[in-house]
Amino acid sequence: MRCVPVFVILLLLIASAPSVDARLKTKDDMPLPSSHANIKRTLQMLRNKRCCPGWELCCEWDDGW
C-alpha cells in the first residue's frame, strides 16, 4: 500500500514534464520554407510565365508585382 502514493506522484511528474523532440538532427534535415518564401516563389514563377520570351526588357519594366 505504500507504493501507491509513490506511483501516483511519479505519474504526475512524468505527465507534467515538458515534451522534448528526442530526434537528433542530421545533415539532411532542412527547415521548411516559410509561407512568405512560397508566395514569393509563386509570384516569381507567374512573372516568368508572363514575360515575353526572347525580350527581357518587358519584364524589367513591369514593377507592378
UniProtKB/Swiss-Prot annotation:
GO cellular component: extracellular region
Keyword entries, A-Z: Cleavage on pair of basic residues, Disulfide bond, Gamma-carboxyglutamic acid, Secreted, Signal, Toxin
Main location class: secreted
Positions of modified residues (4-carboxyglutamate): E60
Localisation per UniProt entry: Secreted
InterPro entries to which the protein is assigned, alphabetical: T-conotoxin (IPR031565)
GO MF term list: toxin activity
Annotated signal sequence range: 1-19
Family matches, as Pfam families: Chi-conotoxin (PF16981)
Positions annotated as propeptide: 20-48
Family statement: Belongs to the conotoxin T superfamily.
Name of the molecule in the record: Conotoxin mr5.1b
